[in-house]
UniProtKB/Swiss-Prot annotation:
Residues 14-50 form a coiled coil. InterPro entries: Uncharacterised_YusU. Keywords: Coiled coil. The keyword Coiled coil applies. It comes from the Bacteria. This is Uncharacterized protein YusU. It comes from Bacillus subtilis (strain 168). The keyword Coiled coil applies. Pfam families: DUF2573. The gene is yusU.
Amino acid sequence: MRKLLAVFSKGRWKMEQKLQEQLDGLLEKYTELLLGETNDELKEEVKQWILYTHIAKSMPPLAKHWNATYPDAKQGIKEIIQHIKELNEAHRNKQ
């Protein structure tokens, strides 16, 4: 049984690693299409923007609570949103 669990766990880890790599590729391409360029810092900003905007749209009370609890983080996410908006507009104007 232990051996079976070890094999299952190892297989699951490989699937999770593969999924993580594929999601990272998706995020990289999305960042490139959205902003016209990509790097680790931009990918992280886009990931945070995606997460926050999804939560704000799907569970507004949770986002409101988080904003009230962490006003410094709220300011940080506002800056990220503004930065992404500016980069996106610049990218669209180049096309």
